[in-house]
Amino acid sequence: MMKHEFYYTSRDSVTKIHAIEWLPDREIKGVLQICHGMVEYIDRYDEFAEFMSEHGYYVVGHDHLGHGKSIQTEADLGYFDERKGNQYVIGDIYQLQEMTRKKYPDVPYFMLGHSMGSFLLRQYLTMYAEGLAGVVIMGTGHQGMLTLCAGRMICRVIAAFKGWKYRSTFVDSLSFGGFNKKFEPGETSKEWITSDKKKRDEYVRDPLCSYTFTLGAYYQMFTGMKVLVRKGSMKRIPKTLPVLFTAGSDDPVGAFGKNVTKVYEKYKDAGIKDVSIHLYEGDRHEILNEVDRQNVYRDILTWIGERNKTKAES
């Protein structure tokens, strides 16, 4: 297995997007593109990416704008352009897919999105799902239109006084404030992330996982999420696209499984034929960093392998 870092120009025409590819030592069975979550970065997926690469998959992913190494200065951490940030982030995912397809045009192409990356991937599917062999939607959730509109309005009001690069603890608290409630008393306020103490401590100590989103980033994230709750938003998703929803049963982002199931049911109701759900009992938000993560890895590998075989036979 070989790991290689590279950069490409963001759709914002300014930022250099940092990306990593994990290349297997054997013939490539398929491609897996990963979309990471909020306030983290792609190299945190190294253990899982190595596992998939060892089993013959080319894995690739990038740091979203305002994350990891996809910044110009440290002040850019947690910042999206307040006008077109969501458009740029989606565009960067598409660019990476196009580059990767040119390298490997003849193998099945899978995608995985975690947390914020799951919301981005769900939005992405309403535009660019054609030709995908399957997608894994991990650690997702659901917010209603009124909640998202209220969130955008609050961002606009505060930004009128503080500017779009302001980091509002109030907005941050509205978004994440209640997530740790079930796990109190805790040492870090991040117990909701994973039950694996070692992984959790690494997360808490990591400066690239401990900043606050700017108002511009929150505003654009809420803007993108609005797409998901618009009537008819899933009409453009191919009915034959295999979709796996997966999360921890103790993940507050998905309302402890309730909202993951809700989104899963929406996909079924939209007529998508191969849609399934797997909730891991007792796991929290980052199932790829949980104590039973090897089981999660194997389950994802099996699910992708089954769809890969189907794709090869069709």
Provide a role label for each language-model segment.
Residues 44-75:
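Conserved alpha/beta-hydrolase
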Residues 270-314:
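Catalytic active-site module of serine/aspartate enzymes centered on a nucleophile-bearing elbow/loop
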Residues 123-208:
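Alpha/beta-hydrolase-fold enzymes
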Residues 104-115:
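Alpha/beta-hydrolase fold nucleophile elbow
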Residues 1-26:
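N-terminal cap/lid segment of alpha/beta-hydrolase-fold proteins
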Residues 245-247:
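Short beta-strand/loop motif that positions the catalytic acidic residue
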Residues 81-101:
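Alpha/beta-hydrolase active-site loop
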Residues 32, 36-40, 115-116, 249-250:
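Active-site glycine-rich loops that stabilize anionic/oxyanionic intermediates
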